[in-house]
């Protein structure tokens, strides 16, 4: 079940990223809701919140699968990822409160830093958990490396992409969501336990 929910969450993220990337802007880039109207941003944020919660379920499923083993590396990585995903979800909630705001402002800058910290911690957590998964060898083939790949991607493509153009930032997030979709598939095919499917 957690695998299917993670896959669904990732696909929601893919759809949201593509819509945000290619929708006709309704406001100028000086508005925090860009490219959406304030109401549109609220609706988008609700889907992003759902996306993050479903990905959180996926990471919880990874923890329950035993694929990361019982060592400290896997435990620290998984807990770091889960706490950071909760923090990222709270950032999305805070964004709703700024839907009518101009940008940049001290509040939008602070929220931007919070997004950055949460994203970095997700990356760190996934790298640690991914190393543990690779060492444990419960998963085989591409699944053995997908968690580590997802963590490394935060630093290699996500962060550089977000600091590039608006379009590039959205597209790298779509790529990252596809990696979470692969995690969902890995959980579905995982032999232990049945609840990960």
Where on the chain are the PLM-derived regions?
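Hydrophobic, aromatic-enriched alpha-helical segments typical of multi-pass transmembrane helices
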Residues: 1-197
